[in-house]
Amino acid sequence: MTLLNGCQIRPAQAAPTVNTVAERETGQEQTIPVEQKVPQNQQGMAAETIKEAAFHGSTVTIAKSQKIRAADITEEEIEAMVRMAASDLKTVVKNGQTVVLKPNLVQMIVDSTGELLDQEVNGITVDWRVTKAVLKMVRELNPDGKVYIMEGSATGPTREVMKYFHYTPDYMEGADGFLCLEEDCGAWQDFDAPEVVKVELPDGLLHKTYYFNRILYEADVVISIPTLKTSSGVVVTGGIKNVSIGTPPGNLYGVAPDNPSKTAMVSHKITDGELDRWIYDYYMARPVNYVIVDGLQGFQSGPVPMSHERKETDKMNMGVIMGGTDAVAVDTICSLVTGWDPESIGYLNLLRENTEAGELESIRVKGAYVDELRKKFTIRKPELGGIQLEAGNGPSLEAEAGRNGDQLEIQYKTGENACKTEIFVDGIFQYSGGTVADGEIQLNIPGLSAGTHEVQIVVYDRFLNKTAKTIEV
């Protein structure tokens, strides 16, 4: 295996072992059509006889609304988007389990003015309708188990924040409890409280011992529900930071008994690396099982608004929901969608280095192309770190394809900045893998009918800028 431009690449294989989780989709409802990413079988051949190949990496699905304004997306559309983005949730949630949903409800006010945030689609906190849709899906899969919604707001009390943002039984049926971390982790500074679990982490990078809420730590499934936003502390905040910073018990790690803010538990200076090491450690002590990102609005220069004016001007109007079982993969795609190099994000680097997760070659994005969604999110203090992406085009691509029975033979040449290749036949996924500058891929496709078929080759650089070519064979 060779390393080119920060990407792992390998020569094309005669018998690919990777496969898809599902075909790129166009959405469940006409109300949220998603741009086609692959050609349809316009010749009318029997494309349904072709089977998807297998993909053993991580899949991140993006559902994109076609509404011009995020504020116009309805509750019904939001549920359809969540169902599309979390279509593989059934592989994680089973009946009889204890499931914890952890939305980001950081606070309900603008720091500088004290004014209240919008209750819906504000970009800072997770819209209650997103969490409601997740709760509904979980209950369908898990009617007999326990489902809790849990949060520890930075500026509390969390109970008031939940009530303001409609996180109550009146708005969300089916939850067994709405748990506020400062209420459900024992008394102030009681590290031996029965509601708390002490976790030893011998390989911890910052500390060797961490404390968790017992229900969270012992849950069968933890689903992180962050918003899509940038923050000077970690550049991009996503599914991992949402639990690593949002779930440490406020009564243990908070500033004071009446202040659950966890700013004192760890340095938030990205330059000294403490925050990244804390995020890494806390996540490794209790990884999440699924991530669903509320990107309906998106927000730059977070984690909260800087002023009354920027409460509105820093909204990004993204109109997306993202989901996946691999939090490192989801956060990597979040960084690329918001215009930041994932290799400049400290906690993601630590996770890649220590777990081998998050390599683009092993991530498949369904639903919408990253480079077509990308917007340039700013952060408050760029001097603290992070590399913002510049506008770029996909790698160069020349390709030819031929057929011998059920076997396709594809020759291609691409630029040295190419990182990965995907191949579709009649719109059905067949291959994903690393890329070499001058390669050949042979695919055996049982059921490939007689007649003309469309083969699409897509190559990406490590920022998921793409170039595609369609060939009739």
Feature locations, PLM:
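N-terminal export leaders
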Residues: 1-3
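Edge beta-strands of extracellular beta-sandwich domains
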Residues: 466-473
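N-terminal and secondary-structure boundary signal
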Residues: 7-13, 18-412, 416-420, 425-433, ...
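Surface-exposed, short loops/turns at beta-strand junctions within beta-sandwich domains
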Residues: 444-452
